[in-house]
Protein backbone atom coordinates (compact mmCIF):
# COMPACT_ATOMS: atom_id res chain seq x y z
CA UNK A 1 0.00 0.00 0.00
CA UNK A 2 1.34 3.47 -0.81
CA UNK A 3 1.83 6.23 1.78
CA UNK A 4 -1.07 8.19 0.28
CA UNK A 5 -4.66 7.57 1.26
CA UNK A 6 -7.58 6.85 -1.04
CA UNK A 7 -10.61 8.42 0.67
CA UNK A 8 -12.98 6.44 -1.58
CA UNK A 9 -11.83 3.13 -0.10
CA UNK A 10 -14.70 1.04 1.37
CA UNK A 11 -15.20 1.02 5.13
CA UNK A 12 -15.83 -2.00 7.32
CA UNK A 13 -19.48 -2.70 8.12
CA UNK A 14 -20.23 -1.39 11.61
CA UNK A 15 -23.73 -1.25 13.02
CA UNK A 16 -22.85 0.60 16.21
CA UNK A 17 -21.88 4.11 17.22
CA UNK A 18 -18.61 5.78 18.14
CA UNK A 19 -20.33 7.54 21.03
CA UNK A 20 -20.15 10.96 19.38
CA UNK A 21 -16.36 10.96 19.22
CA UNK A 22 -16.21 11.48 15.47
CA UNK A 23 -18.61 14.44 15.65
CA UNK A 24 -16.02 16.35 17.69
CA UNK A 25 -13.28 15.12 15.36
CA UNK A 26 -14.96 16.81 12.38
CA UNK A 27 -14.01 20.26 13.74
CA UNK A 28 -10.57 19.30 15.05
CA UNK A 29 -8.91 16.30 13.42
CA UNK A 30 -9.60 12.63 12.97
CA UNK A 31 -7.46 9.62 12.27
CA UNK A 32 -7.79 7.07 9.51
CA UNK A 33 -6.42 3.56 9.43
CA UNK A 34 -6.17 1.57 6.22
CA UNK A 35 -5.40 -2.10 5.75
CA UNK A 36 -5.90 -4.92 3.30
CA UNK A 37 -8.17 -7.67 4.59
CA UNK A 38 -7.50 -11.24 3.51
CA UNK A 39 -11.18 -12.19 3.83
CA UNK A 40 -14.38 -10.90 5.38
CA UNK A 41 -14.14 -11.41 9.12
CA UNK A 42 -15.37 -9.79 12.30
CA UNK A 43 -13.08 -7.72 14.51
CA UNK A 44 -13.47 -5.80 17.74
CA UNK A 45 -13.74 -2.03 17.40
CA UNK A 46 -11.55 0.04 19.78
CA UNK A 47 -14.66 2.12 20.59
CA UNK A 48 -16.66 -0.98 21.55
CA UNK A 49 -18.72 -3.42 19.53
CA UNK A 50 -17.73 -5.42 16.49
CA UNK A 51 -17.44 -4.70 12.79
CA UNK A 52 -16.94 -6.79 9.68
CA UNK A 53 -13.85 -6.03 7.64
CA UNK A 54 -14.14 -6.26 3.90
CA UNK A 55 -12.12 -8.52 1.67
CA UNK A 56 -9.46 -6.23 0.18
CA UNK A 57 -8.82 -2.61 1.14
CA UNK A 58 -10.49 -1.11 4.23
CA UNK A 59 -10.62 2.49 5.53
CA UNK A 60 -11.83 3.33 9.03
CA UNK A 61 -12.03 6.75 10.71
CA UNK A 62 -11.42 6.99 14.44
CA UNK A 63 -11.21 9.96 16.80
CA UNK A 64 -7.88 9.16 18.48
CA UNK A 65 -4.52 7.87 17.30
CA UNK A 66 -4.42 5.44 20.22
CA UNK A 67 -7.58 3.78 18.91
CA UNK A 68 -5.88 3.27 15.54
CA UNK A 69 -2.80 1.82 17.23
CA UNK A 70 -4.98 -0.54 19.29
CA UNK A 71 -6.79 -1.71 16.16
CA UNK A 72 -3.44 -2.12 14.38
CA UNK A 73 -2.18 -4.32 17.21
CA UNK A 74 -5.31 -6.45 16.92
CA UNK A 75 -4.96 -6.71 13.13
CA UNK A 76 -1.32 -7.73 13.45
CA UNK A 77 -1.85 -10.26 16.23
CA UNK A 78 -5.20 -11.85 15.49
CA UNK A 79 -5.47 -11.57 11.70
CA UNK A 80 -1.76 -11.54 10.74
CA UNK A 81 -2.28 -8.29 8.77
CA UNK A 82 0.87 -6.18 8.83
CA UNK A 83 0.24 -3.64 6.07
CA UNK A 84 -1.90 -1.21 8.06
CA UNK A 85 -1.16 2.52 7.86
CA UNK A 86 -2.36 5.38 10.07
CA UNK A 87 -3.09 8.90 8.83
CA UNK A 88 -4.18 12.18 10.45
CA UNK A 89 -6.99 13.90 8.52
CA UNK A 90 -7.50 17.62 9.17
CA UNK A 91 -10.91 19.33 8.70
CA UNK A 92 -9.63 21.19 5.61
CA UNK A 93 -8.95 17.82 3.92
CA UNK A 94 -5.17 17.80 4.41
CA UNK A 95 -3.83 14.31 5.14
CA UNK A 96 -0.64 13.55 7.09
CA UNK A 97 0.95 10.08 7.09
CA UNK A 98 1.76 9.01 10.66
CA UNK A 99 2.55 5.34 11.18
CA UNK A 100 4.87 3.57 10.46
CA UNK A 101 6.80 6.77 9.81
CA UNK A 102 9.83 5.38 7.98
CA UNK A 103 8.00 2.38 6.53
CA UNK A 104 9.17 -0.08 9.18
CA UNK A 105 7.27 -0.75 12.40
CA UNK A 106 9.11 0.40 15.57
CA UNK A 107 9.64 -3.12 16.91
CA UNK A 108 11.43 -4.22 13.72
CA UNK A 109 15.09 -3.64 12.88
CA UNK A 110 15.75 -1.06 10.19
CA UNK A 111 19.26 -0.61 8.79
CA UNK A 112 18.80 3.15 8.51
CA UNK A 113 17.40 3.63 12.02
CA UNK A 114 19.90 4.88 14.61
CA UNK A 115 19.85 3.01 17.90
CA UNK A 116 19.19 5.10 20.99
CA UNK A 117 20.33 4.14 24.51
CA UNK A 118 21.65 0.79 23.34
CA UNK A 119 24.50 -1.03 25.04
CA UNK A 120 26.80 -3.40 23.16
CA UNK A 121 26.70 -6.21 25.74
CA UNK A 122 24.15 -8.50 27.34
CA UNK A 123 22.47 -7.66 30.62
CA UNK A 124 24.61 -10.25 32.40
CA UNK A 125 27.72 -8.20 31.64
CA UNK A 126 26.38 -5.09 33.43
CA UNK A 127 28.59 -3.66 36.16
CA UNK A 128 27.68 -4.57 39.71
CA UNK A 129 26.13 -1.41 41.23
CA UNK A 130 28.16 -1.77 44.44
CA UNK A 131 31.38 -1.42 42.40
CA UNK A 132 30.40 2.07 41.22
CA UNK A 133 28.54 3.28 44.30
CA UNK A 134 31.05 5.86 45.58
CA UNK A 135 32.61 6.77 42.22
CA UNK A 136 31.62 9.42 39.71
CA UNK A 137 30.33 6.75 37.33
CA UNK A 138 26.71 5.76 36.91
CA UNK A 139 25.65 2.13 36.53
CA UNK A 140 24.50 2.80 32.96
CA UNK A 141 27.85 4.31 31.79
From Swiss-Prot:
Its main location: plastid. GO terms for biological process: photosynthesis. It holds the Pfam family PsaD. InterPro entries: PsaD, PsaD_sf. The keyword Thylakoid applies. Keywords: Chloroplast, Membrane, Photosynthesis, Photosystem I, Plastid, Thylakoid. It is found in: Plastid, Chloroplast thylakoid membrane. GO terms for cellular component: chloroplast thylakoid membrane; photosystem I reaction center. It is a peripheral membrane protein. Belongs to the PsaD family. PsaD can form complexes with ferredoxin and ferredoxin-oxidoreductase in photosystem I (PS I) reaction center. This is Photosystem I reaction center subunit II. The lineage of its organism: Eukaryota, Rhodophyta, Bangiophyceae, Bangiales, Bangiaceae.
Amino acid sequence: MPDTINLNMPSPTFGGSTGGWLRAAEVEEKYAITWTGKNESKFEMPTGGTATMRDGENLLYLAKKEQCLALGTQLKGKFKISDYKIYRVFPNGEVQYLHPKDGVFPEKVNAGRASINSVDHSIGKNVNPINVKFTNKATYD
